[in-house]
């Protein structure tokens, strides 16, 4: 299977180390990532208006490129995953959006949602398996208590993304456990960190982040791990240490 890879803007800039680590780990685990030869920003925010056709074009172009090379598209950024998978769902289920996008792009073969969109964590869980991952860990994170921070883009809306249970997810805890650490469950792991609110209302964003960190710390977490580089930035740059 060919795992076409969409890195996205953040993993190509601010979170380049995460991108490099993900590529290397994928090679070791046997699913080398093949970066799309050309890609554009996904838009970062899913367009809610059904007539927002231009905002969907870059995601569809990436989906079409993946369709032509095996039909699987993997991304690591929760925001990119959220946007691209929801746009893919639009193309598969919404006739009006599909017709308008295809009319604009003038594709030789119209696109109708054929590409499978996977988050990197889904590949680890469903294609590789936690047992194999655990066996290949060379430096287990022993005696580390780690809280998973899901945020709001990785899981919702559950009916479309279908990555894990929206209220009681387990994928990141299983990942943490496979790395040798002890996963810590805390109530705010699915709450929004503020996202782009940091640009408009930094004080409110700092409060949200502080609440999340303090909640995790009160449950025994020594550190947090997240699948979203944007969340990682917010959690690092804003709020009290917890």
Model-found features: residue ranges?
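Iron-sulfur cluster-binding electron-transfer modules in prokaryotic oxidoreductases
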Residues: 1-242
């Amino acid at each position: 299977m060919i795992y076409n890879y969409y890195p996205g803007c953040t993993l190509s800039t601010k979170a380049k180390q995460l991108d490099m680590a993900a590529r290397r780990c994928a090679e070791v685990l046997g699913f080398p990532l093949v970066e799309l030869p050309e890609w554009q920003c996904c838009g970062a925010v899913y367009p809610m208006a059904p007539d927002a056709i231009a905002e969907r074009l870059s995601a569809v172009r990436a989906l079409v490129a993946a369709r032509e090379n095996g039909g699987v598209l993997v991304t690591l950024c929760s925001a990119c995953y959220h946007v691209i998978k929801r746009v893919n769902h639009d193309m598969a289920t919404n006739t009006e959006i599909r017709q308008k996008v295809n009319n604009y792009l003038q594709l030789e073969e119209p696109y109708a949602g054929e590409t499978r969109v996977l988050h990197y964590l889904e590949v680890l869980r469903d294609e590789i398996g936690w047992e194999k991952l655990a066996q290949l860990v060379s430096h287990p994170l022993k005696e580390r208590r780690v809280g998973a921070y899901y945020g709001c883009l990785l899981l919702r809306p559950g009916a479309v993304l279908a990555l894990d249970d929206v209220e009681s997810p387990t994928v990141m805890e299983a990942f943490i456990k496979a790395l040798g650490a002890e996963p810590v469950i805390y109530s705010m792991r699915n709450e929004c960190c503020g996202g782009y609110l940091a640009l408009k209302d930094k004080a409110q964003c700092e409060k949200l982040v502080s609440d999340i960190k303090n909640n995790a710390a009160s449950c025994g977490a020594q550190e947090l791990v997240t699948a979203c580089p944007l969340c990682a930035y917010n959690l690092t740059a804003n709020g009290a240490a917890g």
